[in-house]
Amino acid sequence: MIYVKAEDLKVGMRLARPIYNKRGILLYGRNDKITRQGIESVKNFGLIGLYVLEPAEPLAPMSVEEMQFERFQTMEVFRLRDELNAIMMNKEPAHLMQATNDLLKQFGNLYHKINFNQNLRSPEDYVYKHALNVAILSALISHRAGFSLMEQSEVVVAAFLHDLVKLNLQPELRGKTENLTDEERGQVARAVILGIDKISNAFNLPAGVKGTLMHLCQVQYLPENAPKDISDIVKALVVANAYDEYTAMQIGMDPHTEVDAVRM
């Protein structure tokens, strides 16, 4: 399986992963040969590239659960993009709590391991995909840690919103997680604080979300101002955020393995 940028796709290449639209409808299945129309669709969807099979490569097995996970990710990234963009325009995120409830139904009550799929990110879509994955991981952690339903809801909403105003940063800084200069770290910290300020108290969100986000910001970027006692919700967010950042797949960067992330 190799990754091919959208501009380098060729008619007849076989897809290694399925492609869904924003409503979760399967457009192209695994092992389908991509057509000229399909290549145009990829570009219109804003996809930066696809995983394809090499000419003689057999199709690797993929469970129904894994395919459902990819479908869920695709739909929720589109929905989360709309909700975060609404807040950036000073509008109510009308469907954010429904997205929270849907995610908790899917991942907030599991008793078995899942194959956590990392989706490839561009600088333009990094914030949305990162926020969704942190929310999924936070839901999994919160269940195993015995959080109440209210706490689970708070941690998922906070995960959705924790990088909100990074959308205003230059694209190359949005997904940069290693080797930040002091100036870049300051830019990111200011963006995160501005994001908290953009979350209106009038929004229909869990009451503790803004406090949780400020606490998380202090732990991540302003440790000298962080309280000594870190809440369990913030601890879950720190772990989920670090795991996703460490294992994320970005163009031009080699991801770390899950084993590396656990040892981190």
Residue map of PLM features:
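A broad detector of the eukaryotic-type serine/threonine protein kinase catalytic domain
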Residues: 24, 85, 139-143, 222, ...
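Residue-level preference for alpha-helix termini and adjacent loops
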Residues: 8, 14, 18-19, 26-27, ...
